[in-house]
Amino acid sequence: AMPINNMLGYNFRLGEIECAIGMEQLKKLNGLVESRRALAERLAAGICELPGLSVPYVADGNTHVYYVFPLLVDPDVAGVSKFEIAEALKAEGVILATQYQNLHLLPMYQQKTAYGTSGFPWSAEFTRQDISYEKGICPVAEDMNDRTYLGFGMCTYDLTESDVDLIIRAFHKVWAHKVEMSR
């Protein structure tokens, strides 16, 4: 059987009906993004003082759409791992992603087997053959994936201010009880 998880650059083309729906949805985009920004700012303000937790930084003149609300945990300062934090927040009803896949570590790159069994683009004569995707070439991304990154999928939910306030309370509850988590 041909592997289905080793295709680079899927070509997803939309039909007319999907495009019509998309055109209508785009009319709502600015309002949805502004609402999500306001909620993200509320969330960031509510949890930014928790020791060992970093909220997204947006430099002046830049914007963020908060597809994901990324957090960084310093386990040494927090006193617990990101996995323990995620598990405790899950018990409070807040679901966080604990990993953001490092693409260079996917089997497709490790084995250089894209596009079925052809090995393209690595098998092509115009491709450098000495390209390595070994663990360690992206140390910051790998550390984030292994130890520090947590992500809240803000675009997954139709959140209200009161929902965000509940999430903030859940974070504070977890931080108040993190000593118990590390036992």
Named regions from a protein language model:
Residues 1-183:
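PLP-dependent aminotransferase class I/II
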